[in-house]
A protein has these predicted regions:
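A structural signal for short beta-strand/turn segments enriched in small hydrophobics and glycine
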Residues: 72, 76, 100, 104, ...
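Basic (Lys/Arg-enriched) interaction patch that binds polyanionic ligands
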Residues: 87-106, 226-235
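Extracellular/periplasmic ectodomains of large secreted or surface enzymes and adhesion receptors
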Residues: 212-223, 228, 258-273, 386-397
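Ferredoxin-like iron-sulfur electron-transfer modules
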Residues: 14, 23, 39-68, 78-96, ...
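N-terminal secretory signal peptides and thylakoid transit peptides that target proteins
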Residues: 219-250
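C-terminal compact regulatory domains
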Residues: 297-299
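C-terminal segment of N-terminal export signals and the immediately downstream linker at the start
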Residues: 246-288
Length: 425
């Protein structure tokens, strides 16, 4: 339902156009003096980057089995990725689409522009300040993007975990792709990649991703809450009249930045809480590693844990009667989620395990098997929330105690008055 337009909204509309009305000559001169040669030019290569493979994080390299995990090769539209027992490589034919980085469970591909946390912050910033934010690709847009248009080499470069984290927080995210744009694209695996990722996130969150196919229908308006916060911040800070011809204040931008900063702090605190609970290192002195995508998912679940039970994954379980303590499984796990403890037993930390199944694949004795599980282990209690709840419980307790004392005092006072009245009679 549309929000009711009130007097403050009218004043904001007037203020936004006041500069052009009060300085007509300057406005006209700016239009006349516009030089297209010095203006920024559309450059699609700016949004593309060849992934840098990190062989240390590759499951197939760590397990010395090139077929242990082939998700990146399966999604690559030009077969540009090679995996051997010693190295993960990307050759010159790479289209820089980013699909490999989106599907790799251990984030073995580094693309600076497409790092999960960086992408999340970029999209969240625009979702918090605009009525709509649009995820699109270089082929679909073909021009310099507006502020609330997030341009990717391919929409499939956004992982399913990132879609999930965004849908849990925002309901104004859409994809902009004109009809037929994917049909003629040489990144032939991109359409299936992004439809699968979005469907996964929609099913878990109950959200609905918007789809826009007409460029004329794109909405670049700031959200009502953002504009009001921005305007009121200007009035409070400068003390000017409501229709003074000044630049818009940054109050709204500060509020958005604070929201992003709070999310980052929540992710960092979650990581620290997890490390305190299970230890930074395992018994082999290897540092356990959380992928950025896993951090974002866990941060969302910490705030809204309901979808965790619907998540489908797998965890390894070990039959110790078959285990020879060879350590092959621990060597294959690049995130160090599995360890052989000091008592000679296999231990798995579910929060760090991505359910790839490579540990079970390399176990020659068949001691490890993968079993279905949900995402309950990814819900880490918020220590601050627990503290706040304890404080609230204490306040409720004190209120009840105070009420009992007050009731007792009033009853005693009533009895006293009753006795006085009886004695006077």
């Amino acid at each position: 339902m549309a929000e009711k337009h009130d007097l403050l909204d009218d004043i904001i509309d007037i203020t936004n156009n006041w500069g052009a009305v009060s300085k007509p000559v300057e406005t006209v001169m700016n239009g006349i003096s516009f030089d297209p040669e010095t203006a920024p030019q559309w450059d699609p290569s700016k949004y593309k980057e060849r992934p840098r493979p990190n062989s240390v994080r590759c499951l197939s390299v760590a397990s010395k089995d090139p077929k242990a995990c082939t998700k990146c090769q399966d999604v690559c539209p030009v077969n540009a990725i090679s995996i051997t027992e010693t190295a993960l490589t990307v050759n010159e034919s790479c289209r820089k689409c980013g699909l490999c980085a989106a599907v790799c469970p251990t984030e073995a591909f580094l693309i600076q522009k497409l790092m999960p946390k960086t992408l999340y912050n970029s999209i969240a910033k625009q979702a918090a300040s605009h009525d709509h934010v649009y995820i699109t690709c270089t082929r679909a847009l073909g021009r310099i993007p507006k502020e609330n248009e997030i341009v990717l080499p391919c929409v499939g470069a956004l992982s399913k975990e990132l879609w999930f984290s965004l849908f849990m927080e925002y309901d104004n995210i859409s994809v902009y792709l004109p009809l037929g744009v994917c049909d003629r694209c040489r990144t032939t695996t991109g359409e299936e990649a992004y439809t699968d990722a979005i469907s996964y996130a929609e099913e878990l969150t109950g959200a609905a991703c918007g789809l826009e196919v007409d460029e004329k229908a794109l909405d670049h308006e700031y959200s009502r809450a953002y504009k009001r916060s921005q305007f009121l911040g200007q009035v409070a800070r400068t003390g000017t009249s409501l229709v003074a011809g000044h630049n818009a204040a940054i109050k709204g931008a500060q509020a958005v930045a604070q929201r992003i900063q709070n999310h980052t702090q929540r992710v960092n605190e979650l990581t620290r809480s997890l490390e305190q609970a299970v230890g930074v290192q395992n018994s082999q002195h290897h540092r356990r590693m959380l992928t950025q995508r896993r951090e974002l998912v866990m941060a969302a679940l910490q705030k809204w844990p309901e979808p965790a039970k619907q998540m489908k994954s797998e965890l390894p379980t070990c039959d110790m009667s078959k285990c020879t303590m060879c350590g092959d499984c621990t060597e294959a796990c690049v995130l160090h989620a599995i360890e052989l403890d000091r008592d000679g037993k296999i231990q798995i930390e579910p929060a760090y395990c991505v359910g790839c199944g490579v540990c079970a694949r390399v176990c020659k004795e068949g001691a490890l098997e993968m079993h279905p599980t949900d995402g309950s282990a990814l819900v880490v209690p918020d220590p601050h929330a627990e503290e706040i709840e304890r404080e609230r419980a204490e306040v409720r307790k004190l209120k009840q105690q105070g009420k009992k004392v007050l009731d007792s005092s009033l009853k005693a006072l009533g009895d006293t008055f009753g006795e006085d009245s009886s004695s006077k009679k």
